[in-house]
Regions:
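Alpha-helical cap/lid subdomain in secreted, periplasmic
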Residues: 2-3, 93-232
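N-terminal secretory targeting modules
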Residues: 1-42, 46-54, 62-71, 102-105, ...
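Low-complexity, intrinsically disordered short peptide segments enriched in small/polar/basic residues
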Residues: 6-8, 34, 71, 76, ...
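Conserved SGNH/GDSL esterase-like catalytic core that processes O-acyl groups on lipids
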Residues: 36-40, 46-131
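Short, mixed-charge, low-aromatic patches
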Residues: 13-25, 48-58, 86-94, 134-137, ...
Length: 232
């Protein structure tokens, strides 16, 4: 009995650690109220909030919700390890979360994705990425798209060339950011250049060189907030 209880506590404690540090993969979407402006934050682990302490409060969509207040409803549709490209190992469009983000009928879609596309096993090339990015964005219909470039990726002490942690290729990340800028101009989307901002603020990115820190998540939320307030 004691052994079973101890095991349960261990498992429960382990899950709690994963949950509160943004590693459980659990969703935190809720229902919007009538009259609220709906904001769907779509993306990968950057949007989800991977590795951020006290994740339920400190992922960037949660911070954005607090900044915007009751007149807005923000849902986090970020899913770690997923990618734009349909040929990748984990295409975002194959997810139930993707279908849920469509059904949410958002007024604004804040889209930030591409880090996992940069992995050697996923990267097919600029044309394929551009085509699949356009397909994804167009699937949101009449929603206003706020298109964010992905955060800059940095080499670390353990990863000094070609590929950094999580198999991310910083040079390909730079290329993906440029493609995203071009797509925003082509489609007339609102652009937030998170890639350029994070390049100037290494402290916005955690020690792994890839994921935003708590400070970085707050900075991203502030940038999105500034745009939404200007729009409304």
């Amino acid at each position: 009995m004691v052994l079973v209880l101890s095991f349960a506590i261990l498992i429960g404690g382990g899950f709690a650690y994963l949950y509160f540090n943004g590693m459980s993969g659990m969703s935190n979407t809720t229902e919007a109220k009538d009259g609220q402006i709906r904001i769907a934050c779509v993306g990968d682990s950057t949007t989800y909030g991977h590795g951020i302490s006290n994740w339920p409060k400190n992922n960037y969509p949660a911070i954005l919700q607090n900044l915007l207040g009751e007149g807005y409803h923000v849902n986090n549709y970020g899913v770690s390890s997923h990618a734009v490209q349909d040929t990748s190992d984990r295409p975002y469009m194959n997810l139930e979360h993707y279908q849920e983000s469509l059904a949410y009928d958002a007024d604004y879609v804040v889209f930030m994705m591409g880090s996992n596309d940069s992995k050697p096993e996923n990267w097919v090339g600029a044309d394929a990425f551009r085509e699949d990015l356009l397909t994804l964005l167009e699937s949101y219909g009449d929603a206003e798209i706020i298109l964010c470039t992905l955060p800059s990726a940095f080499f670390t002490d353990e990863h000094t060339e070609n590929v950094t942690s999580h198999d991310i290729q910083p040079l390909i990340v730079d290329e993906i950011a440029q493609i995203t800028r071009e797509v925003a101009a082509e489609k007339g989307c609102i652009l937030i250049d998170i890639h350029a901002l994070t390049a100037q603020h290494r402290e916005w990115i955690s020690a792994d060189g890839v994921h935003p820190s708590k400070v970085g998540a707050a900075a991203i939320a502030q940038e999105v907030y500034n745009i939404l307030i200007k729009e409304n």
